Amino acid sequence: MAKQLSIPSATSGSKSHSLAWRPYYEMTKPKVVALMLLTVLVGMCLAVPGSVPLQPLVIGMIGIGMMAGAAAAFNHLIDRKIDGLMARTYNRPLPKGRVSIPKALTFAISLAALGFVLLYTLVNELTAWLTFASLIGYALVYTAYLKRATPQNIVVGGLAGAMPPLLGWTSVTGEFHGHALLLVIIIFAWTPPHFWALAIHRKAEYAKVDIPMLPVTHGTEFTKTCILLYTVLLAIACLLPVLVGMCGPVYLVGSTLLSCGFIYKAWELKFDDKPGLAMQVFRFSIYHLMLLFLVLLVDHYLWV
């Protein structure tokens, strides 16, 4: 019997080629970037009383999104060894060998460079440099140093992740404004309880790879207390836009309800021993931030 030759079909080759981009897309953390871009968009909209000019809106979103994706890719590169040891991240492209280190590095640098050039040439220099500073803050200061150096890593490093509303604001106006900084303060206060809830759930994994997250170094109960205190601090921060006349009653009602919900979930985490509460707090925090900025947007166009 003659041997049968296995010849790859054009269809299978095309399918394989079409899937080649997926690991690179995954390295940009698209869900995280999408939430971040929502806060950028709100920053843009709140910067002007009417409609946002088209060029800074479109190019700004693309450029900031590209540099945020690049920062995420650098995070994948720097954390590739510990990612391979953690259940949450072991299936990422680099630990699994779906992308080589040189290709991942080339991708991250190219994405960052293109995003920077777009912002610098078609938006404004201030936004380009602020976005670059955010990339350095997240990829190098937080991921490469703070994450491994101190249990306060996410508190200090959270500033880089809190910058997007300011980036959106400067994309449109080309200058700093106190109102934009209030939005930064909100995300800065939101970040620790968001990440600490996840860290409680993944405490054993962080301990395994010697990452000094707060639950690992100070214990779960102490971390739960900190989460509760930070949700109260966040609730106060969320009132600041109302106190300075930046927002109206729609935002006041919406933000108050969201703050009460977050405090309740944190209280439940602290004083209830039901399993799975940490991940409930983590998931609620994502919806909290998303809905809070949507309420900001609605209030702006109803109250302006």
From Swiss-Prot:
Q: What is the lineage of its organism?
A: Bacteria, Pseudomonadati, Pseudomonadota, Gammaproteobacteria, Alteromonadales
Name of the protein in question: Protoheme IX farnesyltransferase
Its BP terms in the Gene Ontology are: heme O biosynthetic process
What other note does the entry give for this protein? Carbon 2 of the heme B porphyrin ring is defined according to the Fischer nomenclature.
Write down the chemical reaction(s) this protein catalyses.
heme b + (2E,6E)-farnesyl diphosphate + H2O = Fe(II)-heme o + diphosphate
Q: What is this protein's function per UniProt?
A: Converts heme B (protoheme IX) to heme O by substitution of the vinyl group on carbon 2 of heme B porphyrin ring with a hydroxyethyl farnesyl side group.
Q: In which pathway does it act?
A: Porphyrin-containing compound metabolism; heme O biosynthesis; heme O from protoheme: step 1/1
> Its GO CC terms?
plasma membrane
Enzyme Commission numbers on file: 2.5.1.141
Has UniProt tagged this entry with the keyword Disulfide bond? no
**NCBIfam families assigned to the protein according to its UniProt record, in alphabetical order:** cyoE_ctaB (TIGR01473), PRK04375.1-2 (NF003349)
The record ties this protein, via PROSITE patterns, to: UBIA
Annotated InterPro entries? Protohaem_IX_farnesylTrfase, UbiA_prenyltransferase, UbiA_prenylTrfase_CS, UbiA_sf
- Which residue spans traverse the membrane? 32-52, 54-74, 104-124, 126-146, 154-174, 180-200, 226-246, 247-267, 284-304
Gene designation per UniProt: cyoE
Which EC class heads this enzyme's classification? transferase
Family indicated by similarity? Belongs to the UbiA prenyltransferase family. Protoheme IX farnesyltransferase subfamily.
User: Mind telling me which CDD domains this protein's record contains?
Assistant: PT_UbiA_Cox10 (cd13957)
Listed GO MF terms: protoheme IX farnesyltransferase activity
- Compartment(s) where it occurs, according to its Swiss-Prot or TrEMBL record: Cell inner membrane
Q: How does it sit in the membrane?
A: Multi-pass membrane protein
